[in-house]
Regions:
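Helix-hairpin-helix
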Residues: 1, 26-27, 34, 117-119
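Acidic, metal-coordinating catalytic segment for phosphate/diphosphate chemistry
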Residues: 2-5, 50-164
Length: 164
């Protein structure tokens, strides 16, 4: 699907989820400004006790296409919304930055970041569970993507620059 159409659909989904979320961001290839989009990735922090309501809202969006909503406490997948899959990743304040970074991609960029993290004594958790000091097995408090790049000794890259 072309990016312009995907952005419109992503914004439709986000408008449904906005009342239920403290914070959200459209991620993936849309955020990287790729011309073609295979799916819609959204990262959100639900308001207190709103996870079930988010799933219910996605199920309402799924009905016209007889699509399904699957997943659990950290990830929900809407199999089809007007012809495109929607993946909703559930974060909290501690996992927001790494989950947004990882779900923005690209896959090759994430691999390079994970390699760099290991080189400097960290583990960048692909599931978005944070940046971990390997020697102490403790998460590093990072709240922005910029902080993650800084911890890894790298200059920040805008999402559109994260293709490898």
């Amino acid at each position: 699907m072309n990016r312009a159409d995907a952005v419109i659909l992503a914004e439709d989904v986000v408008s449904e989820l906005t009342p239920l979320c403290e914070k959200f961001e459209i991620a993936g290839s849309i955020r990287r400004e790729r011309p073609l989009v295979n799916d819609i990735d959204i990262v959100c922090i639900p308001k207190f006790l709103q996870l079930d309501a988010i799933k219910e809202r996605l199920e309402l969006l799924a009905k016209p296409a007889r699509a399904t909503v699957t997943g659990g406490d950290r990830y929900l997948k809407l199999s089809s919304f007007k012809g495109i899959q929607v993946d909703v990743y559930i974060a909290d304040a501690q996992t927001w930055a790494t989950l947004l970074l990882v779900r923005t991609g690209s896959k090759q960029h994430n691999i390079k970041l994970a390699q760099r993290a290991r080189e400097v004594g960290y583990k960048l958790n692909a599931d978005g569970h944070g940046l971990t000091w390997i020697s102490k097995d403790v998460n590093v408090p990072v709240h922005t993507e910029e902080q993650i790049f800084k911890e890894l000794g790298l200059a920040y890259k805008e999402p559109r620059e994260r293709e490898v």
